[in-house]
Amino acid sequence: MRVIEIETGRRLDLKVADGCFSRVAEAGTAGEVSGWVLPGLADVHNHLSLASPAGDHAEPGERVRASASLELALGVLALREPGSPDDASAALAGEPGWPRVITAGRFLAPPGGYFPGLAREVDEAGLATAAEQEAARSGGWAKIIGDFLNEQRQFTPNWSAAGLTQAIARVHERGGRVAVHALCPAAVEDAIAAVADSIEHGWAITDDHFAAMRLAGTAWVPTLTEGGSDTVCAFAASMGIPADTLEWMRCAVGAQSAIAARAHAAGVVVLAGTDAGQGPHGRIIEQVELLAAGGIPPRDAIGAASWTARRYLGLPGIQTGAPADFIRYDGDPAGDLGILRRPAEIVLGGQVRQQSANPVPLGVRH
């Protein structure tokens, strides 16, 4: 089939055999195209076993599969789970018929340093070993909770800067990567100094951090929220967070989308992550829309939830020999993001998972 690659605008001839792209070649300008394609959507911050459509009382494996099924139906063909209360998602890694799932094992936090019952709790002396263990038995990632609420309900780092740096260095020595949950200024600065591979949420990230993040290769996953600071602060207020902290949160979260756009312009890798589990699943397209609304060019905002994210995760795109993961649209979503909600075809590993009512023949071998 002849298509236009959304990332580059190239006209390509694609052939699929045995679940992979058997041919990806530049096409001439003559002839009609079957649509516009990207290598699937990707959510780099998704907790599959939390807030699952299966319900909180279902078994972990059932919760994970229900969440993954919902995401797949929307075209999420790859996702990273940066921390989980269990290991159920690891069963999907490499299993045919499911999104490409990269896990980070259990959340790592000190006693009392995260929401009750969610984290593997370790003291600072054991953090490096625990991070190494989680990365080794997961998808090569570890997730460290960098800060949380203290007794005064103020956000404060969970670890010393030295302790965090040691843990990240240990994982890096073994070839792994580390995502750090960081909200407050001190936790953000410690994560950057420790060369975290990604900062999750990053409420306190400012323009002053961009150069160091770019140099370290630290990506930012802002997990923007529909409703912005009002939504976040309403949740925080229910936890008894004092007025001065709520006001800081309101300002920080309210500025996030614009800061993310400036970070992108400065060369920081900004990626789309929904934080599904904290809220409902199935919101990756909303995340693209929020990134674009903040000022990231629409094509780049799509990339943050597709080709840019896949490259960051070490997954191939549309190339000869790669798994045939792609979505075809009848128009270019960079010109109208609403097109992302109307896929003509979702293909995973060469298998058509979803079609529009009148699909264009793609020549995919089932």
Show where each model-derived region lies.
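His/Asp/Glu-enriched, well-ordered alpha-helical/loop segment
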Residues: 173, 253-332
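Divalent metal-coordination and catalytic microenvironments
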Residues: 19, 34, 42-45, 75, ...
